[in-house]
From Swiss-Prot:
GO terms for molecular function: protein-macromolecule adaptor activity. Residues 32-47 have a biased composition (Acidic residues). The chain crosses the membrane at residues 149-169. It comes from Schizosaccharomyces pombe (strain 972 / ATCC 24843). It is found in: Cytoplasm; Membrane. This is Uncharacterized protein P22H7.03. Keywords: Cytoplasm, Membrane, Transmembrane, Transmembrane helix. It is a single-pass membrane protein. Its main location: cytoplasm.
Length: 181
């Protein structure tokens, strides 16, 4: 990148000066194969001017708020630039941490006892206990299990009949019709 003739401390340079340098560099950019700078119509147009076209160098950052705000900006960041010009250079647009103050909760917060006290019993602790016995017998031959198995068998037979039995039965029926004719 090329250096501008204006010497400022990099950390204290206003945004307009950076925009001015960027526009200067973009206007004079030369690609590797070209000998002439780019000639874009936007730079020669009477209607449009690049952002920061009429910016004069300032002696210090304290003179930043004296700038004339009547010039028109043609930039997608117009609102951000305008607000930065009105407030002057700042550390952050959101203020500093010291200006925010502390936030105190109106309700006192208590720590969750269940997280640090293993003697407190939860309702679902029996689910994690391997030797828990609730008195039910563990018979796998129940009416519900039998109905579930019967339903699975009927669904399987129905699918087999649909995709295997129906084509076979329709082929047999077609052969019977041919023999009759």
């Amino acid at each position: 990148m090329s250096q501008s003739p204006i010497d400022y401390n990099e950390s204290l340079r206003p945004d307009d000066m950076l925009d001015n340098e960027l526009n200067y560099e973009l206007a004079n950019e030369v690609s590797a194969g070209d000998e002439e700078p780019y000639d874009d119509d936007i730079w020669e147009s009477e209607d449009l001017e690049p952002v920061g076209h009429d910016i004069q160098p300032m002696d210090s950052v304290s003179d930043f708020h004296v700038k004339d705000f009547s010039e028109k900006k043609y930039s997608p960041y117009t609102d951000e630039i305008a607000s930065a010009q009105l407030t002057g250079p700042s550390e952050s647009a959101f203020g500093s941490a010291s200006s925010l103050g502390t936030v105190e909760s109106p309700v006192t917060m208590q720590s969750a006892t269940l997280l640090w006290d293993p003697s407190v019993k939860e309702v679902d602790d029996i689910l994690h206990n391997e030797d828990f016995y609730d008195g039910r017998d563990l018979n796998i031959f129940t009416l519900r299990g039998f109905v579930n198995i019967l339903t699975l068998i009927l669904l399987s037979c129905g699918l087999l009949m649909l995709f295997i039995g129906y084509p076979i039965l329709s082929a047999v029926e077609v052969e019977k019709q041919r023999k009759k004719n």
